Amino acid sequence: MRLLGKLRASAASSAPLEPAFSNVLTPNRIPEFFIPPRLPTPYAPESSPPAAALPRRCAAEPDLWLRGADDGAGRTDWDPRSQAALSLPHLPRALTAYGFCALLESPHTRRKESLFLGSPSSAALPPAPRPRAHTYGGGGGDAPLAPGARSPIATPAARGGPSPSLDTLAPPPRCRRLLRAPEGLLRRALRAGRSRGLARARSVSSGDGEDDDEDESRASPGSPTQAPVTSLSPHRDPRPERLEAEGTVTLGRAGGALRLAAEYNRASGRLRVRLLRAEGPAGGAAEPRAPVGCRISFVLKPRGAVVRRSRRAVLEQDLCLDGLSEDEVRRLAVRVKAENRGRGLERGRLLGQGELLLGPLLLL
């Protein structure tokens, strides 16, 4: 028994000892930290099956796919995102029981971690030509590959020899258009957004510009309808820089009206409102000797936020505001209050009041 114990101890000392608790962290055994974490694969790769039973993509790259011990029947890659990921060369794949290539699944979340499970060795491989490149983007993969360019890659794997070298797997320059497909999609989306913004700017332009376009189209009946659109520069702003309009404020109690003129400059943000004349009883027609005073105030909604107020009794006066954006002018309103400044009991009598929105007036 003593001899058997010595033999057993010598055999155990000659074999490499494995730690009893491999999942316990000690100062001498701390794994390298990565984001996202690189977890070990719970199964080891088996020997590669014959190339005749493999699809063309897996046979061309035998080192990029791993066959798991459990090929779940519920695994599916029919969604568009998985189909697009299958066309990328650096993602690991697994062979299903039916002979198809599928993406590997994460062992701890049971999700397709197509970007996190790739090993550094497989990620360093250059992209190889594959016929399903058109599933990821619109460019690339339209022209079929020549059989001569595909034979040197598939021949070593079919004969059971060593895996092809990196120089052999290097694709021709025309097959690298797959990596530039997202840039084309982004460029197309930006161009579509720019065209929508230009169409919106044309829709909110003033009516004077639309009348000018109609006059130009009527002046040249022989010219095609697309000629005015193509003659405009794409960088030119179709909206006018200065907007001018006139409006009438009706005084409800007195039955009269006040005529206002508004002018807005887009470049400087300057708004100018001028009270032109008073019509009806507010203009002094009923009582010629009684002076009329108009109190004008700019009101920003919500009501009560008074920006500027004028108490002068002069009708033709200019009220200016600087540094206003289009959104502020769109919400701005002119509130006019007319009162009689006569003598005795008639003094301070309210003749009427009204309000005029500047946004619809200036077509903003």
From Swiss-Prot:
It is found in: Nucleus. This is C2 calcium-dependent domain-containing protein 4A. Residues 220-233 have a biased composition (Polar residues). Keywords: Nucleus. May be involved in inflammatory process. May regulate cell architecture and adhesion. The lineage of its organism: Eukaryota, Metazoa, Chordata, Craniata, Vertebrata. Belongs to the C2CD4 family. One of its GO terms (cellular component) is nucleus. Residues 254-364 form the C2 domain. The gene is C2CD4A. Signal peptide: none annotated. Residues 118-175, 192-242 are annotated as: Disordered.
